[in-house]
């Protein structure tokens, strides 16, 4: 299927596909078993590649091989058809490349290897040709691969092969390693060879982890232009590290470090053996933190903990908190190193012991506390205000909606109560884990209330399926009064539409839209660095509401869908799969959304149990002259 051939519920596709990825996993594995490439099992348990020493020539040749392997992987017709196990082919050619004593010899080896896979440059149909030229006019980001013409490095034979391959336009990738799905979404879940445990002494498997991840970023990461480091240099520098360190911990930590170079708070990392978790300590205090200008402040804790809300953490088991934050930055990807509450919360309060010595500052006094910690703790400690129920505020003059505690069907009941109030506070500072599907759609019905007309608020940029590595201007997202009915009027199947929204937004198999009134009071949206991903989308959708004001601090700066990646050794990580900007093209990734009015929570306020951001919101509604 061509990426641009079908558009279903386009305005919702980013969100819908985000829900679909998990459901697709088992079916993808079933399909994989039926592909020709799955029959090549020679290296299923071991690549047979071992490297004890690595010369500069070998490092350079492996660097070239990684790029050649990746460029071919996403373009060659036999590979995109699912007929060639390209991971296995990597293991077949690595030993030969390692034996080469010059770049010229390595280039000839790679050319001979690739010539086993001949191809013809395809001719597009009239429909495909028209579509291709339409796509070319929408280019947003272009991969740089002039290196395929560098004959001094590659040699004539290899350069000829790659240049010829660059003329191929990918028109069918349903069975490839990167499948283009509806909504221009790229799914790489089928690229999961050796997703189980590996022999960590196996150099080939370790290099596969590096090469796979590097090339996924090279060709399918829409924010490559926002990376600080030279991605090509990162590959070169990482080769000795992955080639020579032959144990589980060094491999997992090296891959974790690799993911930080994309600077993306969607870059979640998990290894089934909990290596990263163990690195910071197997035991965790049952407490949550909040970052206030670089200070780690306790924002919630279990009742029996000697920690108190408002404590400033100074050190844990003798290691300064600054050193621990530095270590987190080394292994955990964040869009902005100064906004890390979401990403680091799980790792900061860890210890190798059941009782951690945590130094804090409380009311200006330094204290040393013996804090109970729990092994592999799946803690659920709410931050100040996170579990606040939606309610009336300010003598029932203000309606307060906490997105984090909304349940299915709540919104319309609340808005019925809040009709006629002077103002509405929408709190988008906390994620709603239990009701994630509801949360992902909630901005649409809210928009029906607070936006008198439909407006676009978010522009998407997606991969060009014809030419891997190129990104194009894609669809936009809209919300506002009449938007849901507008989608039904476009002929979208009402049963399917209602099924998707059967979570309190639409509750009829006929697709009938709820009758929602126009809310005319002031609207204050609360935001901070914990406002991430779908919450950022929500805030963006409300920004142009006529009576809306966004207050708080900048958001996390990680927007777009999440693309899951599997790497050898039971490693799962992810990236943002679509680029997102404001409608005028202004950047949101890494820098976050900017509030209209900056309001910061203070350490003193947290210690006293005050929510200073809500206090300011109430003031803005009840005392308009203070705005």
Label the predicted regions.
Residues 2-10:
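Bacterial N-terminal signal peptides that target proteins for export
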Residues 31-98:
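N-terminal mature-domain "stem" immediately C-terminal to a signal peptide or N-terminal signal-anchor/transmembrane
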Residues 43, 57, 73, 82, ...:
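Cleft-lining beta-strand/loop regions that shape enzyme active-site pockets
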Residues 57-58, 63-70, 137-179, 186, ...:
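PDZ/PDZ-like domain segments forming the peptide/carboxylate-binding groove
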Residues 64, 80-87, 91, 95-191, ...:
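Extended, small/polar residue-biased N-terminal targeting/export presequences
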Residues 140-167, 302-303, 308-421, 592-601:
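C-terminal, low-ordered peptide segments at domain boundaries
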């Amino acid at each position: 299927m061509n990426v641009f051939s079908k558009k279903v519920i386009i305005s919702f596709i980013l969100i819908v596909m985000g829900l679909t990825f998990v459901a697709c996993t088992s079916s993808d594995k079933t399909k994989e078993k039926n592909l020709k490439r799955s029959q090549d099992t020679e290296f299923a348990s071991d690549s047979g590649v071992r490297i004890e020493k690595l010369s500069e020539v070998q490092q350079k040749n492996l660097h070239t091989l990684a790029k050649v392997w990746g460029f071919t992987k996403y373009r060659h017709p036999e590979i995109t058809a699912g007929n060639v196990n390209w991971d296995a082919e990597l293991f077949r050619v690595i030993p030969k490349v390692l034996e080469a004593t010059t770049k010229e010899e390595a280039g000839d080896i790679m050319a001979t290897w690739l010539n086993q896979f001949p191809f013809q440059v395809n001719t597009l149909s009239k429909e495909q040709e028209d579509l291709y030229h339409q796509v070319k006019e929408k280019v947003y980001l272009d991969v740089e691969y002039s290196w395929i013409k560098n004959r001094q490095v590659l040699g004539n034979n290899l350069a000829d092969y790659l240049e010829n391959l660059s003329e191929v336009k990918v028109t069918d990738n349903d069975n490839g390693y990167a499948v283009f799905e509806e909504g221009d979404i790229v799914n790489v879940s089928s690229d999961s060879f050796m997703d189980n445990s590996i022999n960590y002494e196996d150099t080939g498997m370790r290099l596969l982890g590096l090469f796979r991840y590097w090339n996924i970023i090279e060709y399918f990461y829409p924010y490559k232009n926002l990376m600080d480091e030279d991605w090509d240099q990162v590959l070169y520098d990482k080769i000795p590290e992955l080639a020579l360190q032959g144990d589980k911990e060094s491999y997992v930590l090296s891959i974790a470090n690799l993911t930080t170079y994309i600077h993306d708070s969607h870059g979640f990392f998990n290894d089934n053996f909990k290596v990263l978790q163990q690195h910071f300590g197997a035991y965790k205090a049952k407490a949550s933190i909040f970052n206030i200008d670089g200070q780690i402040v306790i924002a919630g804790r279990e009742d029996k903990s000697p920690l108190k809300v408002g404590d400033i953490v100074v050190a844990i088991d003798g290691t300064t908190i600054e050193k621990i934050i530095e270590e987190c930055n080394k292994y955990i990807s964040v869009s902005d190193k100064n906004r890390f509450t979401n990403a680091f919360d799980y790792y900061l309060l860890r210890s190798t012991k059941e009782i951690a010595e945590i130094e804090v500052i409380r009311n200006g006094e330094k204290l040393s506390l013996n804090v109970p910690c729990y092994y592999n703790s799946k803690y659920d400690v709410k931050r100040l205000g996170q579990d606040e129920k939606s309610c009336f505020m300010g003598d029932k003059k203000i309606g307060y909606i906490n997105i984090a505690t909304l349940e299915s069907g709540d919104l319309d009941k609340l808005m019925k109560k809040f009709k006629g109030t002077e103002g509405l506070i929408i709190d988008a500072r906390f994620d709603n884990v239990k009701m994630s599907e509801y949360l992902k759609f909630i901005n649409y019905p809210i928009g029906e209330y607070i936006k008198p007309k439909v407006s676009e608020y978010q522009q998407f940029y997606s991969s060009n399926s014809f030419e891997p590595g190129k990104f194009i201007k894609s669809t936009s997202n809209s919300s506002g009064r009449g938007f849901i009915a507008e989608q039904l009027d476009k002929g979208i199947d009402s049963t399917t539409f209602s099924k998707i929204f059967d979570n309190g937004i639409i509750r009829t198999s006929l697709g009938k839209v709820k009758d929602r009134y126009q809310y005319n009071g002031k609207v204050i949206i609360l935001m901070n660095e914990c406002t991430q991903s779908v919450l950022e989308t929500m805030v963006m959708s409300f920004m142009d509401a006529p009576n809306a004001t966004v207050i708080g601090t900048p958001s996390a700066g990680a927007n777009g869908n999440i693309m899951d990646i599997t790497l050898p050794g039971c490693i799962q990580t992810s990236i943002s799969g679509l680029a997102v900007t404001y409608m005028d093209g202004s950047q949101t990734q890494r820098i976050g959304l900017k509030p209209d009015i900056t309001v910061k929570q203070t350490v003193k306020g947290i210690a006293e149990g005050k929510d200073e951001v809500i206090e300011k919101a109430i003031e803005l509604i009840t005392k308009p002259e203070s705005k």
